[in-house]
UniProtKB/Swiss-Prot annotation:
Entry comment describing in which tissues the protein is expressed: Expressed at low levels in fruit.
Membrane topology qualifier: Single-pass membrane protein
EC number of this enzyme: 1.14.14.137
Family annotation (Pfam families): p450
Biological or metabolic pathway of the protein: Plant hormone degradation; abscisic acid degradation
Protein name as annotated: Abscisic acid 8'-hydroxylase CYP707A2
Biological process (GO), any one: fruit ripening
Keywords: Heme, Iron, Membrane, Metal-binding, Monooxygenase, Oxidoreductase, Transmembrane, Transmembrane helix
Length: 469
């Protein structure tokens, strides 16, 4: 009885001290009367969305940083936001204080991709999904689909010959097909056209204003998203009936021990297609542009790739690529890194404050979005001298910590980056060893929204090399 009394007394004292601590913490926080970061919120509801997406993001960010400093507020895509532009602040949001900033997108994007997708979660559920994606996309797994990726690359390049192509659109088809083979394995061939039709409608509404009225891009996109989910459900049902174990991402999601619902699986499949397609296609488009504009770099990459072919001939090996070949491409890898830096396909990422947060002397209210500006960091002369210059040699030495984050940072960094680099290396190998290309039309323009792209998607003409070239 005495023990119970002591336990009750100890519990009471502990709770009292905890309450007093919480009160003092609240009063201390409130007494500071922290201001919001400087900046403007723009027009009601619309905010500064159009200013950001209709011009070079560097211009938007630079004008804000010049006027307000490295942290400022704005309003985009229906959300109040705080943008941060220093490597140290980005590390705090993405790594050091990641528990205070959950991954998020604007509500309209969550609805399109699916609220159960990996991007929007943290904790145990996120850890489980990340483990499953890494399991399917780790080197030991993706090396098995190199023949499939190579076949897609060869077929794609052959289809480009003799016609004027929009590089970005063609690369989207290539990366879409690679995404499907990595998610659905051999089953993708049966559903490719259905999936493509629905996804192409969905993507058109991705950056539209979230007005769900008949005829709007957003409304059409949401209908297409429902159809996509139905197709994925059909594939899941067929697999369960056949009781065949697949070594692809869908098989990983469907594992008996995982306990994922069909809705969770569908949301994450659609999310992975989104993550795997447009960004990688954008990188490939910029690579063709930068190689075309820098003959010495193109020559170095071509020589590296041709050397791989010569070694195979000398050793009597098949000319098909294998995993080891892709590890012998340091120059090409540096070109990819420099393209990721200069183009900065993803200008920023979204996080959300899970509570009122004191950050560098300012208040970030609970629920506000927080955007680390990768583009600003990648284009800062403090981090990369002559930042606008395309110079792959800068990656012969590692960049300073937290200054190069093309795939994000921390536990929410992109788990599919090995697959993305692999499919780029494979296509560049066949492109540089077999083809030559020329850019057509204006070459200095850039179009924005949602990704920065060469004007008109980089129109090019591709031709097969002859033995004399």
């Amino acid at each position: 009885m005495e023990f119970v009394s002591m336990l009750c007394l100890f519990t009471f004292i502990s709770l009292t001290l905890l309450l007093i601590h919480s009160i003092f913490k609240f009063l201390a926080f409130a007494s500071k009367k922290l201001p919001l970061p400087p900046g403007t919120l723009g027009l009601p509801y619309i905010g500064e969305t159009f200013q950001l997406y209709s011009q070079n993001p560097n211009v938007f960010f630079a004008s804000k940083v010049k006027k307000y400093g490295s942290i400022f507020k704005t309003y985009i895509l229906g959300c109040p936001c705080v943008m941060i532009s220093s490597p140290e602040a980005a590390k705090q949001v993405l790594v050091t204080k990641a528990n205070l900033f959950k991954p998020t997108f604007p509500a309209s994007k969550e609805r399109m991709l699916g609220k159960q997708a990996i991007f929007f979660h943290q904790g145990d559920y996120h850890a489980k999904l990340r483990k499953l994606v890494l399991q399917a996309f780790k080197p030991d797994s993706i090396r098995n689909i190199i023949p499939d990726i190579e076949s897609i690359a060869i077929t794609s390049l052959e289809s480009f010959q003799g016609r004027l192509i929009n590089t970005y659109q063609e690369m989207k088809t290539y990366t879409f097909n690679v995404a499907l083979i990595s998610i659905f394995g051999k089953d993708e061939f049966l559903y490719r056209e259905e999936l493509k039709k629905c996804y192409y409608i969905l993507e058109k509404g991705y950056n539209s204003m979230p007005i769900n009225l008949p005829g709007t891009l957003f409304n059409k996109a949401m209908k297409a998203r429902k159809e996509l989910a139905k197709i994925v459900a059909k594939i899941i049902s067929t697999r369960r009936e056949m009781k065949i174990d697949h070594g692809d991402l869908l098989g990983s999601f469907m594992g008996d021990k995982e306990g994922l619902t069909d809705e969770q699986i569908a949301d994450n499949v659609i999310g992975v297609i989104f993550a795997a397609r447009d960004t990688t296609a954008s990188v490939l488009t910029w690579i063709l542009k930068y190689l075309g504009e820098n003959p010495s770099v193109l020559q170095a990459v071509t020589e590296e790739q041709e050397n791989i072919m010569r070694k195979k001939e000398v050793n009597g090996e098949e000319k098909v690529l294998n995993w080891q070949d892709t590890r012998q491409m340091p120059m090409t890898t540096r070109v990819i890194q420099e393209t990721l830096r200069v183009a900065s396909i993803l200008s920023f990422t979204f996080r959300e404050a899970v509570e009122d947060v004191e950050f560098e002397g300012y208040l970030i209210p609970k629920g506000w979005k927080v955007l680390p500006l990768f583009r600003n960091i990648h284009h800062s002369p403090d981090n990369f001298p002559e930042p606008e210059k395309f110079d792959p040699s800068r990656f012969e030495v590692s960049p300073k910590p937290n200054t190069f984050m093309p795939f994000g940072n921390g536990v929410h960094s992109c788990p599919g980056n090995d697959l993305a680099k692999l499919e780029i290396l494979i296509l560049v190998h066949h492109l540089t060893t077999k083809y030559r290309w020329s850019m057509v039309g204006p070459q200095n323009g850039i179009q924005y929204g949602p990704f920065a792209l060469p004007q008109n998607g980089l129109p090019i003409k591709l031709s097969l090399k002859t033995s004399s070239t």
